[in-house]
Amino acid sequence: EMGKLLYMTDFEYCKYNFQAMRLNHLVIECNYCKELVDKTAENYTHRLKGHCSLDTCKILVKTNHTAALRTVTLVHLSNEAADPEQILKEIKEAVVWDDALVQIARPGLEVNLDLCPF
């Protein structure tokens, strides 16, 4: 059994709180770091309105974090406006339970979604 998984991508903000569900796995977009977004880019408004920032991702992780959380997999990072090392560091800081695995999705990544890892 894998438990409960929340998958969220292509959103600016999420007004819902899933903490009562005691999620086990988060697969969540972390598309850009605000300071890296090119304000003159043609897709500037779309990036802000149609994608999740690092700041929003951190809030969502903190808001929905419980001791049941086992994995946080970050997806849909921008090639131009994301710093994977910064994102990983800041999301790891948002996850207060040390045993939750935080990682960035890459081609070929396999994530163990078993509820019990043993």
What is each PLM-predicted segment?
Residues 19-107:
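Cap/insert and terminal regions of metallo-dependent hydrolase folds
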Residues 105-115:
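A short, charged, Gly/Pro-tolerant segment at domain boundaries
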